[in-house]
UniProtKB/Swiss-Prot annotation:
One GO term describing the cellular component: cytosol
GO MF annotation terms: GTP binding; GTPase activity; translation initiation factor activity
Name of the protein in its database record: Translation initiation factor IF-2
PANTHER family with a match to the protein in the record: TR-TYPE G DOMAIN-CONTAINING PROTEIN, TRANSLATION INITIATION FACTOR IF-2-RELATED
Source organism of this protein record: Neisseria meningitidis serogroup C (strain 053442)
Amino acid sequence: MSNTTVEQFAAELKRPVEDLLKQLKEAGVSKNSGSDSLTLDDKQLLNAYLTKKNGSNGGTISIRRTKTEVSTVDGVKVETRKRGRTVNIPSAEELAAQVKAAQTQAAPVRPEQTAEDAAKARAEAAARAEARAKAEAEAAKLKAAKAGNKAKPAAQKPTEAKAETAPVAAETKPAEESKAEKAQADKMPSKKPAEPKEKAAKPKHERNGKGKDAKKPAKPAAPAVPQPVVSAEEQAQRDEEARRAAALRAHQEALLKEKQERQARREAMKQQAEQQAKAAQEAKTGRQRPAKPAEKPQAAAPALENKPVNPAKAKKENRRNRDDEGQGRNAKGKGGKGGRDRNNARNGDDERVRGGKKGKKLKLEPNQHAFQAPTEPVVHEVLVPETITVADLAHKMAVKGVEVVKALMKMGMMVTINQSIDQDTALIVVEELGHIGKPAAADDPEAFLDEGAEAVEAEALPRPPVVTVMGHVDHGKTSLLDYIRRTKVVQGEAGGITQHIGAYHVETPRGVITFLDTPGHEAFTAMRARGAKATDIVILVVAADDGVMPQTIEAIAHAKAAGVPMVVAVNKIDKEAANPERIRQELTAHEVVPDEWGGDVQFIDVSAKKGLNIDALLEAVLLEAEVLELTAPVDAPAKGIIVEARLDKGRGAVATLLVQSGTLKKGDMLLAGTAFGKIRAMVDENGKSITEASPSIPVEILGLSDVPNAGEDAMVLADEKKAREIALFRQGKYRDVRLAKQQAAKLENMFNNMGENQAQSLSVIIKADVQGSYEALAGSLKKLSTDEVKVNVLHSGVGGITESDVNLAIASGAFIIGFNVRADASSRKLAENENVEIRYYNIIYDAIDDVKAAMSGMLSPEEKEQVTGTVEIRQVISVSKVGNIAGCMVTDGVVKRDSHVRLIRNNVVIHTGELASLKRYKDDVKEVRMGFECGLMLKGYNEIMEGDQLECFDIVEVARTL
């Protein structure tokens, strides 16, 4: 409620300003003139003062009252019920005492009061006294609460009398007067427009419990009747409710006015469109129809704008207007199509009246617009996958793609509408545009795999253990397996080192054991990690004469990370330098404690060359397998892991698969990473064709669509369509991730190279026989990169060298490395014609050494200083227009004319520069050797003194190596 001035408040109370100022001063409110501002607190102080002066609170009875308003707007009755409120009513005995006091007591008459006001006050006092007398007479017969209900209406303010809904039991005169006042008050809202100031101030004073006496306090002709008043807390609560009600009414009136204006504009546009359509129709038919029904809401709108209608009235009024609109449309016989029809169907209404060409109608609900404009922004919940294109993101948010591009440009990203962005960026864009973003793997067909895995249940049976042999290079891993398999695999490996994962199964008297042989060279870290992932037990081979080496420590870390138990085979114990105890001590330092020392790791001393203790090693492995109780379902679709994969020129993609559960059969549909296909052939490690493979058996399979990545999980699916769908989804997912990484790498490289000299790059194309080999070679070559020379592996793949590889090398200036592969005739011819270098290797060391040498040749040479001699200055000669000339003696080495020199004084370098001239007996010479005198001048420097020394040196370039 806003502040008012004293003059305005006096006008509302119909009192002179001087009287009001006097009463305010008596109440403790200091106001000097009628223009002073009067706050709510000031009014409450005045109210408390008048209450204290005119009467005191008595015993009260609390009853619940409900206010109901019934008004008529254009012939429609609207009833509004307001929230119930507790009112305190004095008891019958106290009311009787107050009436007696009113009859015997009269207040002094103030001279400044007019005669008309005095007459009014006397009439009102007499009416109140008569009402209280009747209440006193009936107090003995009726209950206290009913007596209070009858006596209160005459004493309450007019607005409270208007709001009463409970009828009075007895037909007394005060009750008739209250009914008359109520009927008169019901007519007032339709006669008077909304007056904010009056409405804001009036409820406050009427609720103070003084009625008309609140407007004319302490009239001289009126008797000073004690009035029942409310407490200060209740008064503050009522004032707060009045403020809230006034604010709510003002807000509702503003909303209603805005809605009516909007409706009027809409009706005007609709009427204009209908008139245009009617004119076009009349031009065809020659008939004219009036458009009066559409004008009715527009004419009624201005009259409604100034009425303070409550929400219930507004709702019924709008419903009636919409009914009129619907009748107007139906009267014209048109308008059953278009947006209104769609809108109606959207809201679930299907009340269409269909007839002939002119009889099509659409029945709209009374509270339904033909057109619904959005009133507030719609917030969508957007599920964002790992990668998403800008167009798809815009579609999910129901916005134009340009808006998303703008938001990304504000974030500093220049993108196109078809470009993919990562999940984090997309979530930021979604929040920036006012929607709710949630990360999700949308439309992921891989969920089918989890559902299928849960559905298949089979009996788990014991299976053979999978044992991986790990250790440092040249410690005898493959030789140990050779003795176990009674073969000569080592002789087939180039350089005598293992460069592939070999998978074999061996039948022993106590059962079958599957062995995986991993490389020991440092370049094959990924292979060793894959071997540990697929294994049950690790045999750690350590040479007794060599000790624990870096790859031994790495193998221990892989085994611990995979949670796999270890059996240590101390090899080469037949050598003279063998020291098995030292091996145990070194391994104990890496938390591999022998069981005889209180640990949990079995140590077996073996000799792969002579076959010592091999049976004991197998016994230890089978003992570990019994402890693990290894089982797997047999009668179920097969699952496994791709150990190695390669591209064979005649057979296509060939993958080595280790079956982990189920039975793999020829003709099964296999899914491995992004590759899928029906198994056309299965071959064991000896090259024999087989038709099925049980758990823990390694096989080579043919028939996949592409070379799968080593380490991928493989599984058999019953549906080829589902396998193709999942493989294609993975291909797209990997491609999006790869493109995003490439773009990030390009930006990172661009910023790293900004402001620096571009480093030289050595481009390489690698082709290998198996994936693990090119993986290891590419990783080793990238580690050779320095700040000055970087190795850029443009392409690496499995298979022979093709013409496309040569063409890529031509375009990029790269050379090709063939690891255990060769180029065909056409590729060799093209490479010779275009001077593309192809190098073939079968040992990884040789390839790394050659690339390192090539990188060393690309390094810029290093400059070094080489001291050639020293000179002592013994005399300084000053020559005008020439400068200072030093007479010197060469004390060591030789002084050359083009040498660089340093001037040293007291063992401190003063100047570094070059010689301007070198003479001996007035002759220019190229050099002066030790023991001879000479004269010389320094270029651009004359601050020389006797006793200084000159150090002569040359700058030479020295080739660098990595």
